[in-house]
């Protein structure tokens, strides 16, 4: 029991839409999928609050990773900038 293996944490890639808070950014992650019944390509987006330790700015494309709850809304952290 001393050496338990933890599962891989989820990662997502998105664009920073707001960096006005101190050490927190809002990242919009887009998802494109085909509707199962109508076969139309649908574009959907979600916003995630993430801890910013790198000092990213609005418009940057970043990779975020799941983490422990850091505040009421923050459950993700910025891992790296993606070019």
UniProtKB/Swiss-Prot annotation:
GO molecular function: rRNA binding; structural constituent of ribosome
Keyword line: Ribonucleoprotein, Ribosomal protein, RNA-binding, rRNA-binding
Gene name as annotated: rpsQ
Coiled coil: none
InterPro entries referenced in this protein's UniProt entry, alphabetically: NA-bd_OB-fold, Ribosomal_uS17, Ribosomal_uS17_bact/chlr, Ribosomal_uS17_CS
Annotated function: One of the primary rRNA binding proteins, it binds specifically to the 5'-end of 16S ribosomal RNA.
Domain of life of the source: Bacteria
Assembly with partners or alone: Part of the 30S ribosomal subunit.
NCBIfam families the UniProt entry points to: PRK05610.1, uS17_bact
SUPFAM superfamilies per the UniProt record, alphabetical: Nucleic acid-binding proteins
Organism per entry: Chlamydia abortus (strain DSM 27085 / S26/3)
A GO cellular-component term linked to this record: cytosolic small ribosomal subunit
Pfam family, one: Ribosomal_S17
Keyword Metal-binding set for record: no
Protein family membership: Belongs to the universal ribosomal protein uS17 family.
GO biological process, one term: translation
Identification of the protein by name: Small ribosomal subunit protein uS17
